[in-house]
C-alpha cells in the first residue's frame, strides 16, 4: 500500500512502478457548461460522464434553485429544459461553493433575466476578483452590487434589458469570455469579445452544438441576441487537467506503462502535453476521434528523463490549471524550467505561484517566485517532507504525485480538497500501484 491514512492527513510513500489502464473523470469545464446550457435550452439534455466533483454539483444545485428540473444517476444527468426565460427568481442565495466557473458563468446568464439573485461561495470565492466580469456586465445594462463596488462576492445582480457590446478582455480567461457571450444571448444587437490570446473554447463549441449561431475568428467570438438553445446529447470526455497528474507520474516513475483512455484533446487545453513533449516525455496519442464537438484520444505514457524548458506567452492559457503538477515535473528535470506570463495563478483558489514555490521548497526542491511565474532548478531527486493543499484541489493532487516520487515520501494535509474535481483520485492511484 502506497498511501496510508494518518490521524491528521495522509502519508504518501514512494512508488517504484505503475501499470494499467484508467479513465479519469469527466472534464470539469465541459460538465459545467453542459449542465448550464441544458438548463437554458428548450427540451431535454442528456449528459454522460458528468463530473461528480463538488464544483459541478454546485452548478446543478444553483440550477435547481432557479427552477430547472434535473435528475442524476451516478455520472448520468437528464436536464428538462424549458428555456431560461422560464427561470424564476430564487428564494434563497445561490451558493457556488468553491466554483469560480459557476459564479462567473451564472452571472452572465442572470444578467439577462428579469429578476434579482444573490450569489456567494466559500472563503476562496469571496476573495477572488469578479470585477473582470461584473464591469462589462454593468456596461451591458445589468445592475450588480457587491463588496468593494461589486468587485468581490457576495454579489447581487438585477438582470433585465441588455445592450450588446464590443469587449476587449484584459486577460485570456474562458470564464470572462463565456460570461459576456452568455449575457449577449439576451442582449439587443451583437456582442463581441476579443482576448489578448485564445483561452479554452468549450463555450463556443458547445453553444454551436446547442444551436446558437456563434461566430469566432482568431481571438474574437461574437453572438447576436435572441438565440435559442435546443436540448442535446452531451458525452463528456475525460478531463486532461486530471489526466495531467498521471502523465507526470507515468513519466517520472522508474518503471511501468500507463494507458489513460478517453482524454479530452481540445487544442486550447493540450498545453500540458506540449510542455511535457518539449521536456522529453514519452507520451503517445492513440485512437484520436471527435464526439459532441470535442476531440478526444487515449494517451499512453512511459518513463522518460525530462529536461528544463521555458514556458510563456500563448502557451500559458493552454496549461494554466496544470502548472502545479508541471512544477513537480520541473523539480525532477535536468536543468532549469522557467514559467512566465502566468500572473493569473495568483488569483486562483490560492496564490498558486506562492503556494507551489513554498511547497516545493519544503520538499527539498530549488524553486523561486517570479512576479508572473516560477523558476525551478531541477535535481536528480526530491527529498520529501510535509505538504499542505491550502484547500486547493490542484495542489492536493500535485503533492500526492510529488510524494510518490520523493525519496522519503510526504505527509499531506488537506487531501479532501481533491473532491472538487477528482473524487476518485486516490482510488485510481491505488489501482495502478505495483509494489
UniProtKB/Swiss-Prot annotation:
Q: Catalytic center at which residues?
A: 321
Alphabetized, the UniProt keywords read: Amino-acid biosynthesis, Aromatic amino acid biosynthesis, Cytoplasm, Transferase
Which CDD domains does the entry link to?
Answer: EPSP_synthase
Q: Name one GO molecular function term.
A: 3-phosphoshikimate 1-carboxyvinyltransferase activity
Pathway(s) it belongs to: Metabolic intermediate biosynthesis; chorismate biosynthesis; chorismate from D-erythrose 4-phosphate and phosphoenolpyruvate: step 6/7
Gene Ontology terms describing biological process: amino acid biosynthetic process; aromatic amino acid family biosynthetic process; chorismate biosynthetic process
Q: Which Pfam families match?
A: EPSP_synthase
InterPro entries cross-referenced by the UniProt entry: Enolpyruvate_Tfrase_dom (IPR001986), Enolpyruvate_Tfrase_sf (IPR036968), EPSP_synthase (IPR006264), EPSP_synthase_CS (IPR023193), RNA3'P_cycl/enolpyr_Trfase_a/b (IPR013792)
Q: Which reaction does it catalyse?
A: 3-phosphoshikimate + phosphoenolpyruvate = 5-O-(1-carboxyvinyl)-3-phosphoshikimate + phosphate
Q: Kind of enzyme, top EC level?
A: transferase
Q: Which HAMAP family does the record associate with it?
A: EPSP_synth
Q: Which family does it belong to?
A: Belongs to the EPSP synthase family.
- For this entry, the protein name equals 3-phosphoshikimate 1-carboxyvinyltransferase
Record the organism. Desulfitobacterium hafniense (strain Y51)
The record's gene field reads aroA
